[in-house]
Amino acid sequence: QTRQWQQWFELAAESRDPLARLGWFERIIADANLLFDEAFWQAHAGHGWQVPEARPLIAARAGRADCLLRLGQLGQARDEYLALLALCRADEPACRHPLSTLYAWQGEWDALQQLLVRFDEASCWLLYNKALMSFVCEGEAAARPHLAAAIGVNPHVPATLLGQRRLPKQEPRRWQGGSRDEAALYALQSREAWLTHNALIWLRKSAGKQAS
């Protein structure tokens, strides 16, 4: 069974289309859900990732949420991310990153601020989305230091968001902090948020000043 799930994970990773990826994750979820009842989840609430046999199901649910986000099904994606954050309080699947983008896209600034307080970290997603929030809510001057901090963590994001660097046809399977692959994944998930709030002109101007 685990071998079959691994094959489905591989097929999901190879799929360029988020709808096709979603189908593979749904297969894993439907298969794995049969192994765990409500009592199991209640017994491990907040620490689900600590149970190794539950990790494939949790990872598949996180993958499903990412696909829903890419497909614009934001309500369903939000519900799944929040359920996973309740199940894994330490957020081992890193749902906080795409969830921060979802909140920014929707303009749910209070929710984003609460997420930033809960996870006080210098990660690409949280810093760039914090800069976007500051730009929208407080203006260019207030957002400038937040953007500088984000660029310090990953300098490749502005060029990727602005289309100066071509995006890959499918999401990177692996990435390291500060890498071009991380920037590509952030841009694939988050560009709509920046477009929605008309922030790309400011980003182009501000990133240019940072580079000069």
How should these model regions be labeled?
Residues 15-18, 71, 106, 137-138:
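Structural motif corresponding to the intra-repeat A-B loop/turn of tetratricopeptide repeats
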Residues 52, 87, 118, 179-180, ...:
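Structural signature of alpha-solenoid helical repeat scaffolds
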Residues 5-8, 61, 96, 127, ...:
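TPR repeat positional signature
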Residues 132-212:
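Long, ordered, amphipathic alpha-helical scaffolds
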Residues 22-36, 78, 82-91, 104, ...:
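TPR/TPR-like (Sel1-like) alpha-helical repeat modules
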Residues 3, 20, 49-56, 73-76, ...:
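Structural signature of alpha-solenoid helical repeat junctions
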Residues 1-2, 27-54, 85-87:
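Flexible helix-coil transition and linker loops at the boundaries of alpha-helical arrays
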